[in-house]
């Protein structure tokens, strides 16, 4: 075959396999196995330019680059804060879980987005943030949380390493500075933080609006830190939940259509 001729002539790394977020799990797995049989790690798919910053940021916190809870588990949430995502339009079926949480638990939906979207129209609170200022916004929330003692001290003591460094940095983000940087009124930031901290379990959701920045990986590091501070991890209705852009971005990533990991995120 042409592939075998190429392999014999120029070596296995002369070829590259491009997987797809439209693959189902089995197809993604076989694509990775074919690359291994061919003798190359030159394999990738669309997640490289979509959510690679999420994978890097989240994997450095949890050890793997995936959402921590299922989409259906959002029905168990009592607070849902959404950064840079518009699931009412882009994930209309999945968004039914958000609405079910409102119906079942009187869950509060908070949207942080530069645009007023159809998702924001369903929100209890909406913050029109300046693009690229998500980190100051989250540090402002953390500053309020720590100052008021709303953080989960037992969870942090038992489960979290390095939170004292976050506490120290959060002091550099008083509410007035955060309001100036983000363009969100100080009263609204306090209102959002108080509502989210008081309504547990809370889930934090994001999509491309958080990742597609030069600081995308740093953005996706901050989101889990906020959840850890409140003890919203390891519980139904909590977690950090990333909305993907195509049918099976997560599955194709889980099953190894990547040049730097094997199925199940075993690093190379």
Language-model segments: what does each one mean?
Residues 248-268:
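Surface-exposed loop and adjacent secondary-structure segments within mature catalytic domains
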Residues 1-247:
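Cofactor-pocket helix-loop regions in the catalytic cores of large enzyme subunits
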């Amino acid at each position: 075959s042409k592939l075998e001729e190429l392999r014999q002539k120029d070596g296995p790394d002369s070829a590259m396999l491009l997987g797809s977020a439209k693959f189902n799990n089995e197809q993604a797995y076989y694509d990775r196995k074919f690359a291994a049989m061919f003798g190359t790690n030159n394999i990738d798919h669309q997640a490289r330019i979509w959510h690679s910053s999420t994978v890097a940021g989240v994997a450095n916190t949890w050890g793997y680059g995936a959402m921590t809870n299922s989409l259906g588990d959002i029905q168990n949430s009592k607070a849902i804060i959404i950064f840079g995502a518009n699931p009412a339009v882009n994930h209309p079926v999945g968004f039914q879980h958000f609405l079910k949480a409102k119906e079942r638990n009187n869950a509060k939906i908070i949207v942080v987005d530069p645009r007023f979207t159809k998702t924001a129209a369903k929100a209890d609170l909406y913050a029109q943030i300046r693009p690229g200022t998500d980190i100051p916004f989250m540090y402002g929330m953390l500053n309020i949380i720590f100052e008021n003692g709303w953080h989960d001290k037992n969870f942090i003591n038992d489960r979290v390493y390095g939170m004292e460094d976050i506490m120290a940095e959060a002091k550099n983000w008083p509410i007035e500075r955060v309001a100036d940087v983000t363009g969100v009124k100080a009263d609204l930031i306090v209102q959002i933080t108080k509502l989210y901290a008081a309504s547990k379990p809370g889930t934090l959701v994001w999509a491309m609006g958080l990742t597609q920045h030069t600081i995308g990986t740093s953005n996706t590091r901050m989101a889990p830190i906020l959840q850890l501070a409140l003890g919203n991890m390891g519980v139904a209705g909590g977690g950090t939940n990333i909305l993907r852009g195509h049918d099976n971005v997560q599955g194709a990533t889980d099953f190894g259509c990547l040049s730097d990991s094997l199925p199940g995120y075993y690093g190379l």
